[in-house]
Amino acid sequence: MNNKGSGLTPAQALDKLDALYEQSVVALRNAIGNYITSGELPDENARKQGLFVYPSLTVTWDGSTTNPPKTRAFGRFTHAGSYTTTITRPTLFRSYLNEQLTLLYQDYGAHISVQPSQHEIPYPYVIDGSELTLDRSMSAGLTRYFPTTELAQIGDETADGIYHPTEFSPLSHFDARRVDFSLARLRHYTGTPVEHFQPFVLFTNYTRYVDEFVRWGCSQILDPDSPYIALSCAGGNWITAETEAPEEAISDLAWKKHQMPAWHLITADGQGITLVNIGVGPSNAKTICDHLAVLRPDVWLMIGHCGGLRESQAIGDYVLAHAYLRDDHVLDAVLPPDIPIPSIAEVQRALYDATKLVSGRPGEEVKQRLRTGTVVTTDDRNWELRYSASALRFNLSRAVAIDMESATIAAQGYRFRVPYGTLLCVSDKPLHGEIKLPGQANRFYEGAISEHLQIGIRAIDLLRAEGDRLHSRKLRTFNEPPFR
């Protein structure tokens, strides 16, 4: 038995989502334009009828499927009933939504419906502020007479498993208001359009990795055998094979205007690589993951530098994190530090295999240069000044490296069900007298960065080949929403 009944097919649902969303956006933009030019206020009765609302997507399963799939990490129902969420930017998310709906429609015979919701689209999400010239009273008027962002209605309760049961269960981890909030922040922080983000994400904490990524990306765009067709850069540069002197074209400092600039190496099928320079510290790491998560990336990897804690390590060695000591504290309120963050087997294997492939060394030689162990992430940049306390923590945890971002990124991946991994390169050994000096650091990075970045890129190639198998069931909760 199936309960598709008179419901929509996935394609029909997506088309209706597009139509309802565009209808609301056009109405809201027109109303804003009328207010700015003539002072005309939006029609309150029309608003009550849903003039500016997001579309709502509801999927219902009657529990009749005899052999529901149990091995995949998404596209599953935990119980019979109706699941719903609001949707924004359906064109941007069309491929993702189609995949999720198709699984539920084909494997469960789910009934799909689309209708206007009761939640209005905040006006800042449909206009480009740079195109408006508003005085103080006009800005206040927009906030007074048009729907605005209400922080009380935005949160991660579903992702954190603390939502209150109602007639409808959540269909996805993020509703439209939460997604729109993060899409706006992503553009602000990274300096690039959200449409350019790719599903395979590299994080780094050092600018030189960006230089190498841009150099390699430009060479890939010029290679007719490469799948990469364009490079989108922080600050607005867009590089293709037709761009003259591409590296010169993006050598300006436009990216410096942005807190966490991003570069997107784009493929025709949207399966490329995004690199984000998150800078230093767990606060930035938490922030970017909070917002990137709404795009539902396939994986994010930390590829940066760290302090080596073991005497046997050498400058330039690698550390593959298999556990984390979370001394970053930025997530303690939502994910207590006593909750273990498991390593993801598929990601660990890809990073190790990529190290062998890129270095060209056999397994035994790789093990001499690659150390697997616990990485400490601290929020104290000067942890060295508390040597006694720090040394005790390192001894108890058997830590092999320290940085300020990796555990935060892994914890956020765990929280938001995004596969995660960490491969760091030892840049200094402060416990053993090997500290970074300016000239020494330059020579080290010139030799190490290219190989390290190539390992991250090769690991992404391996993970891309995994397909849906990359998404691990170990990140699911007991009452997981059906959508990935």
Swiss-Prot record:
Any one GO MF annotation of this record: AMP nucleosidase activity
Enzyme class: hydrolase
Reported phenotype of the disruption mutant: Knockout elevates intracellular ATP levels and increases cold tolerance.
Keyword Ribosomal protein among record annotations: no
Presence of keyword Hydrolase: yes
Subunit note: Homohexamer. Trimer of dimers.
Record remark: domains: Each monomer consists of two domains: a C-terminal catalytic domain and a putative N-terminal regulatory domain.
Name of the molecule in the record: AMP nucleosidase
Biological classification of the source: Bacteria, Pseudomonadati, Pseudomonadota, Gammaproteobacteria, Enterobacterales
Gene it is expressed from: amn
